[in-house]
Amino acid sequence: MQQIQSYVQEHKDRFIQELVELLKIPSISADSAYKNDVIKTADAIKKSLEDAGCDMVEICETPGYPIVYGEKIIDTNLPTVLVYGHYDVQPPDPLDLWDSPPFEPVIKKTEIHPEGAIFARGSCDDKGQMYMHVKALELMTKTNQLPCNVKFMIEGEEEVGSESLGWFVERNQEKLSNDVILISDTGMIAKDVPSITTGLRGLSYVEVEVTGPNRDLHSGLYGGAVANPINILTKMIASLHDENNHITIPGFYDKVEELSSDERAKMAKAPFSLENYKKSLDINAVYGEEGYTTNERNSIRPTLDVNGIWGGYTGEGAKTVIASKAFAKISMRLVPNQDWEEITELFKKHFESIAPEAVTVKVTPHHGGQGYVTPINNIGYQAASKAYEDTFGKTPIPQRSGGSIPIVSLFEKELKSKTILMGFGLDSDAIHSPNEHFGVWNYLKGIETIPYFYKYFTELSV
């Protein structure tokens, strides 16, 4: 394994430029106007996997966007690692808050990334982290050091709920057979503090619609006599939390497992500066459920947040109307044991029950998924830990993430495999936000670390 670091250093400029070219393609799965760009990105991933050394690569059609599948099988008797990632990205809105165009990547130095960071939509989530695996395979094949079989499954719908992935997995279980699944779509505690994500929150995503009169009304002629859907919607949403920021939906917490005092004590040992956290977000104080720390609120507790709210007139100037309708999109992050479909139904039942008689309410469920916890005593976790130790010089800290990757629980159910989450991004990388970026050092460190996972997983498996 002596050649790994030297290979990365020798080819780092090309590795960076290849990622930059990939980031130029606006593969926004949520907006059908970018359909051709999403498909173009799948084609680019296919070529990259072929160039990296895969023996077979194919673009697999699904009911939605295609999945790119590739494999490098060196010996069927050796362990097989299945790498999952996604090539679609979040919409870049609001564009006016970006310091540079989101699909014109630039590399700039920052306080956290003095070596430079690539600023572009998808740089960290997940094109940059996914592409680390492509380059790691290239490294291992070009230096003849690959110790195991590697398969790739790269999808184009993660940012819209992976709606076609379950369909694909159920129909391709033999093709996707593996001994462990490896994903880099999470983060580290800090640049110099490697960590392995051992838990993910689940997700329930809904849209609500409140309807009052059959048309927009003149606020002078009708104001005070007719229900205003926007006023009512905001009151209904406000009632979903009590004075302690506890969610008020009946039954919402029934299956939430409280962590033991020992587990909470271990979480508290993770390096975390509340002052730096507030400074990075330009906020004066943190906010959340009473009785829990910021790290706990971010990871082991369920949440309910409004992601968007609209209705009435929002254009320039004034228009005195009472809107006929008001809308909101709401996400609920769930913890293991909470079933997302059950929570969605509880939300729907409660939201409809609190609506005043003067309006009608419609709740439309969108996508969702279950939470996930992986044990730290399996060989996949042990291999990842040893890999980080070799490249970072320190043992990684296990941590639970507040984010969701709903397909992880699907993989365990359908493919009977554990998933290892080796992320290299940072909280400050602004995923889903304007000025998303990914540190050049982190990107190259990921390419350097992944081969060691292959090495140790193979050694621990045979």
Where in this protein do the model-derived segments appear?
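N-terminal helical capping/dimerization or prosegment-like subdomains
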Residues: 1-95, 325
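Active-site metal-coordination/substrate-binding segment of hydrolases
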Residues: 78-151, 445
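A common structural junction motif
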Residues: 87-88, 240, 244, 349-358
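Acidic, glycine-rich active-site loops and adjacent beta-strand->loop/helix elements
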Residues: 87-89, 153-162, 184-189, 212-214, ...
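Acidic/histidine-rich catalytic neighborhood of metal-dependent amide-processing enzymes
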Residues: 122-199, 461-462
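An extended, acidic, His-containing surface patch that forms the Zn2+-binding/catalytic region
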Residues: 190, 248-325, 337-346, 354, ...
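Flexible glycine/proline-rich, aromatic-decorated loop/lid segments
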Residues: 195-211
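Polar, glycine-rich mid-to-C-terminal structural blocks
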Residues: 213-216, 220-277
